[in-house]
């Protein structure tokens, strides 16, 4: 599994309320993204927004982010991390990948 932290600066015309509303509107569309396990939509008071994604593989993540670059014509800041384990207290116990990736 791979965790990707994606960040981008919002245009000045988009405030936190508009960003949150947009995220809530588009969130259901992420249910069918190939390889995506989980996504958290994030924004900060300083005008940055993005997402924390949990992917089955880096290839799945890179394929998705290529589409973002093509659609919006910008490169967000992306950091990739190998994910050794996930504890999600809202659903299942601990999620462990089959092998370290």
What do these predicted ranges mean?
Residues 70-75:
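Short arginine-rich
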Residues 51-55:
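Conserved RNP beta-strands of RNA recognition motif
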Residues 1-48, 58-66, 77-101:
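Short S/T/G/P-rich N-terminal loop/turn motif that feeds into the first structured element of a domain
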